[in-house]
């Protein structure tokens, strides 16, 4: 484990363990090295960095994860979301950890309580682990602290500080809170590359259809051409339009609130899927 780094820079109010967040990024960097070694057929390097990554992950979970409660560290938003985003959480505990994260967001009135590291992780951590409704409410929030609060107060760039009245850390053109832009493509449009088929040769489609949002469209220019993921709500169903570029294929994975098939393989071309929505239970 390591405590090197600046930690969750410019948080709203809650402070996260720097050892937890820095160690997660130590793991991420080690995984990158392992994957690169595999690509370049550096077998010994691949074995070394894979073993090191596994050792780091186990050390993080041994020290910070309460397996009974599904809480990392003190359970604040960043400490729950960063391990989810970067693949630290054991598979069988992902939904429990995500539910705890959603509870934290709900308790904050669907407002952020994160700095730079949590802002990178929180929307993905929610929407990719069964909590897309909470992710959307968080992304659509327009009162302090939120991305929308900046817009409501006239900002046209990404700021360095959630607090518009801050007297330090006040850059008016700072990319560090910018993950929400990518999340629109991933969390709502569901457009992901397939790690086994780089460059969008094969496309993974994992859109979410949160209540309160009736239509959405994302277009992405891949090396093979434009990918389009567009959906609209029609009473008790979603009409989902997909464009798969030439020489590519795709697999659509249905979110939890859709009835029927969980995965559909799609060839190149334009497709329309009629997706019945499950009735919400409160």
Protein language model annotation of sequence segments:
Residues 1-54, 58-112, 116-124:
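The feature captures the catalytic groove of carbohydrate-active enzymes
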């Amino acid at each position: 484990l390591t405590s090197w780094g600046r930690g969750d820079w410019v948080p709203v109010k809650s402070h996260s363990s720097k050892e937890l967040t820095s160690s997660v990024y130590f793991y991420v960097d080690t995984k990158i090295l392992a994957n690169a070694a595999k690509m370049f057929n550096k077998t010994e390097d691949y074995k070394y960095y894979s073993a090191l990554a596994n050792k780091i992950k186990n050390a993080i979970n041994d020290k910070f994860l309460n397996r009974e409660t599904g809480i990392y560290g003190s359970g604040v938003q960043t400490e729950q979301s960063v391990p989810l985003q970067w693949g630290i959480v054991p598979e069988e505990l992902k939904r429990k950890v995500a539910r705890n994260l959603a509870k934290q967001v709900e308790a904050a009135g669907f407002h952020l309580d994160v700095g730079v590291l949590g802002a990178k992780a929180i929307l993905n951590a929610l929407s990719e682990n069964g909590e897309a409704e909470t992710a959307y409410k968080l992304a659509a929030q327009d009162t302090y602290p939120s991305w929308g609060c900046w817009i409501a107060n006239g900002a046209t760039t990404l700021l360095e500080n959630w607090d518009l009245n801050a007297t330090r850390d006040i850059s008016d053109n700072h990319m560090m809170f910018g993950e929400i832009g990518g999340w629109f493509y991933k969390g709502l449009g569901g457009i992901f590359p397939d790690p086994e088929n780089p460059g969008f040769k094969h496309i993974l489609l994992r859109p979410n259809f949160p209540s309160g949002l009736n239509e959405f469209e994302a277009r992405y220019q891949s090396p093979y051409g434009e990918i389009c993921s567009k959906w609209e709500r029609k009473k008790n169903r979603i009409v989902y339009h997909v464009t798969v570029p030439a020489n590519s294929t795709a697999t659509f994975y249905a979110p939890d609130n859709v009835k029927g098939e969980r995965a559909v393989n799609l060839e190149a071309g334009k497709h329309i899927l009629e997706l019945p929505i499950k009735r919400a239970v409160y």
